[in-house]
Amino acid sequence: MYGMLYESVQHYIQQEYGMETWRKVCQIVDCKHQSFKTHQIYPDKLMPDFAAALSASTGESFDFCMNFFGRCFVRFFSNFGYDKMIRSTGRYFCDFLQSIDNIHVQMRFTYPKMKSPSMQLTNMDDDGAVILYRSGRTGMSKYLIGQMTEVAKEFYGLDMTAYVLESQNDICGGTAGPIKLTEGPLTVIVKYRLDFDNRDYMAKRVNVIAHPSQLKMPSVDLNVFLELFPFTIVLDHDMKITLAGEKIVETWILHNPGVNPKTFIGSHILERFKCRRPKDTQIQWETILQMRTVLFEFELIRTGHNRAAYDAALNFDFENFDEASSLNEAQAMALASAKEFSAENAKEEAAAAATSKDEIDPATGQRRHSVGLRSILLKGQMFYIKDVDSLIFLCSPLIENLDELHGIGLYLNDLNPHGLSRELVMAGWQHCSKLEIMFEKEEQRSDELEKSLELADSWKRQGDELLYSMIPRPIAERMRKSEEHVCQSFEEVSVIFIEVMNIYDSGSNNIQDAMQAVTTLNKVFSALDEEIISPFVYKVETVGMVYMAVSGAPDVNPLHAEHACDLALRVMKKVKAHALPGVAIRVGINSGPVVAGVVGMKVPRYCLFGDTVNTASRMESSSDPWMIQLSNYTALKVQKVGYKVEARGFVKVKGKGEMETYWLLEGPE
């Protein structure tokens, strides 16, 4: 959702409930935004989250809060001058209800990423009306009631109450569209009953119907009608094209060279046109009947963009095509006039594509610089004609200037004789729809760029995680800065060695035994990895059956001995809990000075050097199963802070002679 919706929530919560309540709401929601930007997109889930938080803070119901947010938005958008747009839709509230979708269409030029719902007025009487709401979001039905109530009160002076008659796929408190695994996202459909004083509007309708100007006129022949509206399309209940005006057929043939013209009549409208407005509309009979007051915009689907289709057009046998069997005389004449233009246009496009320095899209064969520049848009309204039980799309093409008119193979006398179509083309007006297409193309490229950047960031994070598994983060950051000296001496650290025992019989040549040993070792080492808590303890390496860790490096830690002992105690407890048959571990810990640095080029490793490391290794190798052996210095250090140790006595250590060692029994209380 755009930030303007959340701006209204923030403003009126602060105004009516106080700044402290707003802070509490943000704290409950864990909202990091101190303020909202009008044209920035924010997560949809914030709206129900704010409503739930306000409900918890004030004691009001969730539905009341969503209704309150809807009323707040209507009051708030008047600051942007949008109240004038609402007031200009008509004298009556029903006029506004019929214009909601058209308002959303216009608002998309300012808010291009707006995912607006669709609303149609389905029934009216003296006591109110019924509207049908469709949306890809759930949980917003009470929000809409708040909006409708406030619009009726502020702009039309009506006291309105609303309630839900029917509801499909709506989920209270949600915002993402419901999903069916076999079909994908579902549409939320809610039918509302709006109760208000609608007598004035109904009386006006009766007066209009009874006016002498509305007396029944003689029938008009359909051919005459198609001459008056040469871009008309007639649709049956299956939304298939049953009839079409002369110019729309001619235009389709010109821009679909190589396609059998017989296929136009009888085809589904979405096979020949793409619905651009209203967006995400289901092109079905019942749906379109309810949207007769809504402005529609269709884009002609052309094979002319495809270079292969243009090449095929050069060899298309127009002479042997039997057009008279499916097209009327005017349409057949249009086909005849298209013969020369189709081949000529195909040659021009192919030559331009061959000589152009612009990139050709390998998927579509389109020249990237021309995408969207010559799209043919038809803008108009759907009407139901009872006499023929059909829908008629009365439309006219949106053409920017004379250059574009010639580019799509039309002339001024081809345009509708009524209206200002010809005058606008002569004046060179820039239609907003053309700008919108260009904007959508750029937005699509922007989205692709964002996805590429996100993918690059993901790869970078994976690379960082791999690097940090071999080298500590502080050291890696220093290496990135091209620091030559990454070696560091530490006055005192605690080194831990953990060996897994009885895991593999070295005399066995059985592959299954070896695989079992690897699986068991992986379980133990994975359990040890889970107990490593950075930055208190750092895993150095694993060699064979031995696991090495250190506390106090690379991050200096004055409590290194305590953290090393804590790790050893946790590891003992966790490995015992796994109850691996015959498997045991032994641990050795020693404290003292070390030197640390990165060694290697292809597979760099963070290594520790010094007598402290050797002594810690001897503490482990001379320890007993399920025991933790400490050097004398480490034992005295942790004993002072409450760790329970037991003297083992003097142990003969390779290269050291006899050393006094201790068993670590448990940590402090």
Curated annotation (Swiss-Prot):
* Something else known: There are two types of guanylate cyclases: soluble forms and membrane-associated receptor forms.
CDD domains reported in the protein's UniProt record? CHD
Catalytic activity annotated for this protein? GTP = 3',5'-cyclic GMP + diphosphate
Instruction: Say which domain of life the source belongs to.
Output: Eukaryota
This entry's Enzyme Commission designation comes to 4.6.1.2
Q: In which tissues is it expressed?
A: Expressed in embryos in a segmental pattern in the ventral nerve cord (VNC) and in the brain, beginning at stage 13 and continuing through to stage 17. Colocalized with Gyc-89Db in several peripheral neurons that innervate trachea, basiconical sensilla and the sensory cones in the posterior segments of the embryo. Expression in wandering 3rd instar larvae is most prominent in a small cluster of cells located in the anterior medial region of each brain lobe. In the VNC, expression is found in scattered cells both laterally and at the midline.
Q: Does the keyword Metal-binding apply?
A: yes
What molecular function does GO assign, one term? Answer: metal ion binding
Q: What does this protein do?
A: Heterodimers with Gyc88E are activated in response to changing oxygen concentrations, alerting flies to hypoxic environments. Under normal oxygen concentrations, oxygen binds to the heme group and results in low levels of guanylyl cyclase activity. When exposed to reduced oxygen concentrations, the oxygen dissociates from the heme group resulting in activation of the enzyme.
The record's annotation in PANTHER family points to: GUANYLATE CYCLASE SOLUBLE SUBUNIT BETA-2, SOLUBLE GUANYLATE CYCLASE 89DA-RELATED
Q: State the family it belongs to.
A: Belongs to the adenylyl cyclase class-4/guanylyl cyclase family.
Stated name of the protein: Soluble guanylate cyclase 89Db
Record domain Guanylate cyclase: where: 494-620
List cellular component terms (GO).
guanylate cyclase complex, soluble
Which cofactors go with this protein? heme
InterPro entries in the record: A/G_cyclase, A/G_cyclase_CS, H-NOX_domain_sf, Heme_NO-bd, HNOB_dom_associated, HNOB_dom_associated_sf, NO_sig/Golgi_transp_ligand-bd, Nucleotide_cyclase
Which coarse location class applies to the principal site listed for this UniProt protein? cytoplasm
Question: How does it associate, per the subunit comment?
Answer: Heterodimer; with Gyc88E, in the presence of magnesium or manganese.
